[in-house]
C-alpha cells in the first residue's frame, strides 16, 4: 500500500481467458473507423430562441432547462488576491449533479485491458472520440431526457457481485468554467465475461496510453480516469523492464514507490493547506444579467465578452444516430483560442520530478488545487502587464524543441464545451534549471502525484490529463 493506494498487483489478479475479444491496435483502429462511419452527429449553431427546453429566466437572465435539471448558465462574482485584477463577474456553468466516469477493466491472457466507448459529443473536435465505459451525468442515467439507458451503468452504480472497485474518487473539473463541478471517477475490474455492444471495444492499457500520442482521440473523461490508475506490473507481479529511452526510463522510475522525492508527502500536503489558508477566494452566485458590469453582452446568438476574450456561450441543435436520444438542443461554452497546459520536469537527486502550481480558479470548491506548471489561454495574456504573466509561460513557449518530450493537442469535454482544446506539453528542463521555486510551486515525483489522485480535490483536471499523457512515454 502507498498512502492508502494498493499497488496494481495487489488490486488485480491475472484473469487469463480466450483472447478472441482482444485485438491488435490496428484492428482496434479499424473498428473505430467503422464506428465513425456508423455514428453520425450533426451539430448546427442556432439562436437561443431555438433551444428546445431551454429559456432565459425573466428575473435573473439565467439560462436554464425547463426541467430544472442538467445544468444552467448563471453569473458568478469572484474576489481573489491571487490574480492580476482582483474582482470580476463572469458567466459560469452550474451543474451540481455528480456524474459517473467509469472504466471497466479486465485481464485477457494476463494483460490488463480497458473497455472504451466510441462516443460522439456535440462539442468534439473531429467528431467521435474514445470515452470511458460509462460517461453520464445523473440526469442522463436517471433518464430525465426519457431516452435509452446507459450501457454498463450497473458495474459502477451497483458493482457488488459484478466487479471489484479499484478506484473511486470525486474529482474536480474545469474551475474557470464550472462552479464546484465534480465527477465520480471509477475503475472497476469485471469479475465475469462482459457482453459487448457495437460501440464498445477492449484495448490494452498500454495500447490506450499510446493513443494519447495522437491528437483529439482519447477524450478528457478517459484521460482523467486513466490518471487514477497506478502503473501496471507484469502478470506475475514483478515490475516490467525499464524502457531503453532515457526519458521514458526516468518516467518509469519516478512512478515507482522507492523513488527518492525532494519533499515528503506530509510537506506537500502542508504546503497546499498553507496556500489554501492564506489566499482569498470569495465566490457569489449572481444573476447572469449582472455579468454585464464586467463587459459581458448577450445577443440572439451568443453571450460574449465585449473585448472578444475568454469564451462565448452559444446554442446548438444536435441530431445523433447513436445516443440515448436522437435529437436535442443545448448551450455550449466555446473558448476563445487554444489553451496551454505544460509540465516542466527535471531530475533531482537522479529522480524525475514535476513542477506543480497551486492554482486558484474562479469555480473551484476548496481554493487552489495542484495544476500544471503552466496553465492558461495565452491569448488572454497578450495585454497583461509582464509581472502578471504566468510564471514559466515564456520558458515553455521558448523551450528548445529537443527538450520537449510530449506536445499534442487534446480536446476537453465535448458535452459542455465547443471545440475546447489544450496544447499539452511536457518539457524536460536543463540540469541548471532552479530547484528553488516560487512559494506557490512545488516539485513532486510522479509516484507522489498518483498517490494524491486517490483523494479528492488535490490535482486539477488539466494536471490529471498530463499525468495520463506522460505515462504514454514510459
Swiss-Prot record:
Pfam families: Hexose_dehydrat. Its EC number is 4.2.1.159. DTDP-4-dehydro-6-deoxy-alpha-D-glucose 2 binds at residues 176, 296, 359, 375-377, 380-381. Pathway: Antibiotic biosynthesis. InterPro entries: EvaA-like, EvaA-like_sf. It is an enzyme of class 4 (lyase). GO terms for biological process: antibiotic biosynthetic process. It catalyses: dTDP-4-dehydro-6-deoxy-alpha-D-glucose = dTDP-3,4-didehydro-2,6-dideoxy-alpha-D-glucose + H2O. DTDP-4-dehydro-6-deoxy-alpha-D-glucose 1 binds at residues 54, 137-141, 413-416. GO terms for molecular function: lyase activity. Keywords: Antibiotic biosynthesis, Lyase. Involved in the biosynthesis of one of the two 2,6-deoxysugars, dTDP-L-oleandrose, attached to the macrolactone ring oleandolide to produce the aglycone antibiotic oleandomycin. The product of the reaction, dTDP-2,6-dideoxy-D-glycero-hex-2-enos-4-ulose, is a highly unstable diketosugar, which spontaneously forms dTDP-3,4-didehydro-2,6-dideoxy-alpha-D-glucose. Homodimer. Two binding sites (pockets A and B) for the dTDP-sugar ligands have been identified in each subunit. It seems that pocket A represents the active site and pocket B is a vestige of the gene duplication event. Belongs to the hexose 2,3-dehydratase family. This is dTDP-4-dehydro-6-deoxy-alpha-D-glucopyranose 2,3-dehydratase. It comes from Streptomyces antibioticus.
